[in-house]
Amino acid sequence: VRLEVKISGLPRDRKNTLVISCPEPSLAGVVAVEYLVDTLAMEEIGAIKIAEMPPVIAVIDGAAKLPYRIFYSRQAGVVTIRQHVPVPPHVYSEFINKLLDWAEENKVRMAVCLSAIPAMGEREGDKVYFVTEEGLVERFKQYGFEPIREATVTGLEGAFLDAVLGRSVDGALLVAESRLLTAIKRLTDSGKVATHRDVMLILNDLIGRVGPDVGAALKLVNAVARLAEIQVDTSKLQDHASKYAFLVEKNIEALLRPAARAEKEVPVVF
């Protein structure tokens, strides 16, 4: 994969933390990155072009932009990638490896990938879980994160961990429990949804009605703030997160009801 990084300059500061979102259905990581860019008033310092992708241009206030843009806050020491379209799965591994090569060259201290999972228990909580290399486990515990006890990590999250382990950049996968993904899991466990296609249709419909999981995004923003040792005003996310939890529950309740009754229900929307 030919990947070009066009950048105006990144100070070689060992306090810099690279934050990326791992594309997953709840979009919590994507929302967290967007919120950090806006709230920290991050400066656009470059962009990434993937040569093998069909041309995709993002338009911002009339200006043509590449779909993967690099933002930086010198004060916070946070570098992040704003993704206007998801990185295609078939190029994700190369994308991450070359991004981490660039991070190493620029003396970035740490790289974290943000993602979300269904609740590990009956309901989701406020904990943020992590997977990192063995020598860093105690440090991430000290940040207040919970280690994932036992799991097999595959997909895009697995590609990130495979790429970051053993590098000079410290790396970790951070995951928050998602109300949306928990609700979908409840639905599949109920036996009312049988196929992967049906799950994706319901998931897309739910996201269309209630939006990405801002509750999980809030947990991820707070996690980044702890890692970077900065203050981030999350009041806008907090207000939206409480409304979001209510909307997800009401929509899932309607789907779980017997069909005759569910037909009379109007799904809750903003």
Predicted ranges, named:
Residues 1-79, 85-94, 98, 104-106, ...:
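Accessory terminal and edge-of-domain segments that mediate assembly/interaction
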